[in-house]
Amino acid sequence: MKRILTAVIVLLGGAPLCAGDFKAGFAAVKSVGDSVCTVSNSVIFSNDIVLVDFTLKPEAECDIRCRIALPPTKKWNGEFWGIGNNSFGGVLPPVYDLSAVIGSATATTDLGTSRYIKGEGRKQDVPPAVLRDYAWRATHLMTIYGKRIAKAFYGRDPHHAYFRGGSCGGRQGFSEAMRFPADYDGILSSIPAAFSTVSSAQFLNLYKQTHDEEGRALFTREQLRVVADAPIECMKDRDPKPYAGYVLANPILPERDIDGFLALAAKKDPSLADPDLMRRLKNIFMGVSRNGKTLCHGMLPGAYFGFKRGRSFEDKGGSLMTLRYRRLGFGKVASWDDYEDEVARVGGLMNACSTDLDAFRDRGGKLIVLCGWEDQTTPSPETVAWYEMLSEKYGGFGKTGEFCRLFALPGHAHGGGKGRISTGGGYTVDHLDLLRKWVEEKKAPDSYPHRWKEKDLTIPVPPYPLMCYQDDAGNWKTKRYPEGVLRRPDPSYMPFDPVH
């Protein structure tokens, strides 16, 4: 959405505003403040939308910054939208755009982490209270007080509440559905970083396989690009249209195909043929097992997870391991024993991986989940594994699809990467309408429009476990993904605490 924003800071008691209902509404908004919530005495007035900041302090160490955008009463559509953050928070995502386009009251939060991920704050130890804020509390309280502010400003409750977010924001959406099912009627969680313990295993394994014991990188960016491209070429004669030769139709590959594309990579770049390097590469894609239990499936073939030579993966997001690098109190995980300790200590807090969505389902909640088949940061096998386990609990994909649907987007990478088809959140305002229609009109989304700009093509991605492809005439068809290939994490490595 194109953003045009002219902002004026307005103080209480200052110059009068042109918004007719602002003064009375803001006086009511100020009354929302209590021992936890402090509403700012100043606002940002952009065109005819008011941006109100409020701070939440549920415990002494907490400092949760929030912002809500309030359209004028005559333009409010009656909806409340929560907006997710990215990475480890610390900044306020924009809320003006969505309010301006659809007319919703729109709120977000910095997750209470701003002082700990910037500058000197990164050297501080993070109190447990702030970890709770980041994991679940900031989003929940932002929602509670955001709705109260909307009601105070407009004189009535929102008729529906929705949430959308990607990566960290996708995790926030999962946490809301699992921990606070009454907060939202509909949630769109894209590329969710919701399985911190599993992502930690993937990234710890990735680091160990691509670095020596002194932390020196063993692969160049060019070598890893060859490895990322090899599966596309290896599968081009078996993949259907329109994917063949461009992206993988299905990156959940069996061991024989992993061996095949690694052999092709070594042929393309003979420097990769070293037996130790080939062993390390295979370990990246085959995942990790300990004591007979699977920790993670492995990284996705076709996804590019390159880095500058000599630089580690310390800045990668989405895992327990990297949170300590960002001073969120976890510390550098150096061994698999350390990893096990971290899982036991904080895994249940940081994960949003429960398969108990009874309360969310029973009150009519709807959850749309997106994952990307080239996601290099929150690898999608964990999301697919969770959805398969969820479907087993609720009697199959059909019954589960009555309240939760997963759409796997071919060629889609995480923000910060470069997907062969698309990169980032994977949604637009039009995509948000799919969620609203499901909640308000009971029209479940039978497909998710996935835009392939370079081919001027829109892929009608069906709900998992179906994939779509084109026949020789260019007509879209569907078939099921192969079963039994995904290496699911053992449930013991996916702990979940409802409220920690």
Residue spans for each PLM region:
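Sec-dependent N-terminal signal peptides
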Residues: I4-G13
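Sec/Tat signal peptide C-region and signal peptidase I cleavage site
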Residues: A15-A19
